[in-house]
């Protein structure tokens, strides 16, 4: 029962975290998505640039379709554009794909695929992806239940000031022995030394 109640509380971030929009002012600037603002009147220009492989345009179109801003809401189209941006290494697009696969937004729900996208984003330091990956290890969704990995990823999110990561780490600390926590910390050191690749 305690695990169930904790899981319900921790699920709030799982849903809300993927709803952040990131936009831009300059369609042709090579800036990061965090520096951009979308104007609905630029839809044709966004689509042209996105088709040409522009990461910012792909990312922003995905957000427009996911939120229904300036276009009819269409999760499948959002997944298409997020996937193209994620394939170019955009950590936020990877995180958003994790959310969409977790909840079946525009795709069949698939925790294994969600884990793939969260992991790619988490390896780049995305704290929400780190938290969600830890949460999936805690619950055994898409991966075998593994409190050591759950603790490691929760600690990574927590170390960046992400409160939900700290809460998950605290919950896990109550469920794990001191030797299991020590093992998780050693695992984290090993993974840190290889930039979390394969962790």
Label every PLM stretch briefly.
Residues 60-67, 96-103, 107, 132-139, ...:
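Hydrophobic face of amphipathic alpha-helices that form TPR/SEL1-like repeat modules
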Residues 9-18:
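Bacterial N-terminal signal peptides
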Residues 30, 163-199:
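Terminal, low-structured helical/coil segments at or just beyond the last alpha-helical repeat
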Residues 64, 85, 100, 121, ...:
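TPR/TPR-like alpha-solenoid repeats
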Residues 46-47, 51-54, 67-69, 74, ...:
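Short helix-capping/linker turns of helical repeat alpha-solenoids
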């Amino acid at each position: 029962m305690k695990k169930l109640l904790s899981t319900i509380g921790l699920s709030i971030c799982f849903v809300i975290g993927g709803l952040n929009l990131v936009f831009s002012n300059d369609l042709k600037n090579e800036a990061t998505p965090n520096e951009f603002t979308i104007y609905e009147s630029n839809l044709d220009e966004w689509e042209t640039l996105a088709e040409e492989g522009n990461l910012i345009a792909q990312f922003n179109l995905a957000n427009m379709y996911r939120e229904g801003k300036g276009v009819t809401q269409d999760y499948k189209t959002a997944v298409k554009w997020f996937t193209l941006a994620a394939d170019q290494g955009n950590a936020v697009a990877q995180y958003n794909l994790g959310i969409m696969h977790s909840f079946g937004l525009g795709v069949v729900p698939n925790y294994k695929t969600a884990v793939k996208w969260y992991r790619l984003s988490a390896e780049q330091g995305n704290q929400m992806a780190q938290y969600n990956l830890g949460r999936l290890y805690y619950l055994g969704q898409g991966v075998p239940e593994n409190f050591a990995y759950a603790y490691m990823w929760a600690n990574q999110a927590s170390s960046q000031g992400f409160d939900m990561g700290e809460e998950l780490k605290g919950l896990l600390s109550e469920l794990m022995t001191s030797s299991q926590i020590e093992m998780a910390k050693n695992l984290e050191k090993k993974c840190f030394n290889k930039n979390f690749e394969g962790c």
